[in-house]
């Protein structure tokens, strides 16, 4: 789905919600290259720059203890690491109103 270099620390997994969200953002004309840049950094275990406002969701009903970052001001990525298996799960992407 998201093409990354073959050599990354974490293998990607996608939820069905993410797959549907991804199709939707492509139809909306979002620059998916921006998403790819962020996912590539996360898949390599790198820290995101401050501009992405990366944080853990502690009070979220659906995404508790997942990571969330801003691709654009109202375009989010929700993700989770499974460290013991070196997997990065892409859970959802979309606007605040679409996800929360």
Predicted ranges, named:
Residues 14-41, 46-49:
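N-terminal first-folded block
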Residues 43-70:
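A short, surface-exposed loop/turn module that caps and links secondary-structure elements
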Residues 1-8, 20, 30-33, 37, ...:
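Enriched for short, Lys/Arg-rich terminal
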Residues 8-14:
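Short structural boundary motif marking the start of a folded domain
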Residues 39, 43, 61, 92-94:
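Generic secondary-structure microfeatures
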């Amino acid at each position: 789905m998201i093409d990354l270099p073959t050599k990354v620390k974490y293998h990607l997994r996608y939820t069905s919600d993410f797959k549907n969200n991804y199709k939707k953002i492509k139809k909306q004309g979002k620059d998916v290259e921006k998403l790819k840049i962020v996912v590539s950094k996360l898949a390599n275990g790198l820290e995101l720059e401050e501009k992405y406002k990366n944080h853990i969701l502690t009070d979220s009903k659906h995404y508790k203890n997942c990571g969330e970052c801003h691709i654009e001001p109202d375009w989010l990525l929700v993700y989770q690491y499974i460290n013991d298996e070196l997997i990065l799960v892409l859970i959802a992407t979309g606007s605040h109103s679409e996800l929360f």
